[in-house]
């Protein structure tokens, strides 16, 4: 099920276009008419500037501790390598790796 995101998402970059201090953090691995697959990597102290997400599935290639800020506030989340998640979409959030190890996600978005 695809959902409509609020208007704020129309003014923000998607996760591939968003970066950190002018540098990309995500790389497209595959894209076709049905889906887009990309990997985002965050060394310690590196984050992802404010962006939105369409419907997506995520898989933690390497876990760690991320600080996430969104409409509900700021929290720290520890991801375990091999964990996965699904989201119908995120109007906006920004994250930063506050741990001591690199964090890497594989993201899959249906089109």
Q: PLM features: what roles do these ranges have?
A:
Residues 7-9:
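Boundary at the C-terminal end of the N-terminal hydrophobic targeting segment
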Residues 19-49, 54-58:
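A short glycine-rich, His/Asp/Glu-containing loop-to-beta-strand
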Residues 31, 72-90:
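Short acidic-glycine-tyrosine-enriched beta hairpin
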Residues 45-48, 84-96:
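Histidine-centered metal-chelating micro-motifs
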Residues 53-72:
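Glycine- and acidic-residue-biased ligand/ion/polar-headgroup-sensing regions
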Residues 90-111:
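Ligand-binding loop in jelly-roll beta-barrel domains
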């Amino acid at each position: 099920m695809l959902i409509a995101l609020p208007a704020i998402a129309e003014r923000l970059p998607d996760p591939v276009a968003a970066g950190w201090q002018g540098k990309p953090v995500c790389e497209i691995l595959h894209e076709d008419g049905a889906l887009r697959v990309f990997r985002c990597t965050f060394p310690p102290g590196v984050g992802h500037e404010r962006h939105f997400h369409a419907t997506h599935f995520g898989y933690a290639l390497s876990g760690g501790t991320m600080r996430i800020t969104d409409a509900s506030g700021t929290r720290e989340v520890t991801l375990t390598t091999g964990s996965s998640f699904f989201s119908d979409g995120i109007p906006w959030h920004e994250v930063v790796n506050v741990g001591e190890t690199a964090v890497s996600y594989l993201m899959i978005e249906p089109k």
